[in-house]
A protein has these predicted regions:
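A short acidic, often aromatic-flanked loop/helix-cap motif at beta-alpha or helix-coil junctions
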Residues: 33-36, 77, 116
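Short, Lys/Arg-enriched charge-dense amphipathic segments
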Residues: 40-52, 78-95, 122-129, 142
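A structural "domain/chain start" motif
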Residues: 2-55, 139-142
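Generic preference for hydrophobic/aromatic residues in regular secondary structure cores
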Residues: 21-25, 66-70, 104-108
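Generic detector of solvent-exposed, compositionally biased contiguous segments
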Residues: 43-59, 101-114
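Short secondary-structure boundary motifs at beta->alpha junctions and helix caps
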Residues: 95-141
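Surface-exposed short loop/turn segments
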Residues: 55-100
Length: 142
């Protein structure tokens, strides 16, 4: 009778890990509001990292110890050229705060001549996606 109880306990433990909730990382954004709002940046983070990736990432970099930071900067030069720099980083977490000591970091940048503000914002979103994908690929092999 002792063995079935152990087997049942093992099955319950295994089942709970299969149906575990998707981990939620602390993500902070410090972008220039003219190019990207915080809500847009957080939506890009959410779309770039799916549930499967987050679960795998949590095994190597636990939610309680790590978080992400993004920053999109740029604007227009005097010659009306849109210049954008986007950076994504994995940083250590200390309680509810992130420590700016990047473990992994990636920067993507580009410039586009004769761009409107809408074009410049779209370019900023593309560059942030590239930076996030680069950091993600350096963390776990997909």
């Amino acid at each position: 009778m002792h063995i079935p109880k152990l087997l049942a306990a093992a099955l319950l433990a295994g089942a709970s890990t299969l149906h575990a909730a998707t981990p939620t990382y602390l993500v902070m954004d410090f972008s220039t509001e003219a190019l990207m709002s915080k809500s847009d940046a957080l939506a890009i983070w959410k779309n770039q990292l799916d549930d499967k990736q987050l679960k795998r990432l949590n095994k190597l970099y636990p939610v309680s110890k790590w978080g992400f930071v993004s920053q999109v900067e740029g604007g227009f030069t005097a010659d009306k050229i849109c210049v954008v720099t986007a950076r994504a980083m994995l940083v250590p977490r200390s309680g509810k705060a992130l420590v700016f000591k990047p473990n992994k970091s990636s920067t993507a940048f580009d410039a586009k001549a004769n761009a409107s503000l809408v074009d410049c914002k779209a370019l900023a979103a593309v560059k942030l996606k590239e930076a996030i994908a680069s950091v993600d690929s350096s963390l776990i092999a997909l």
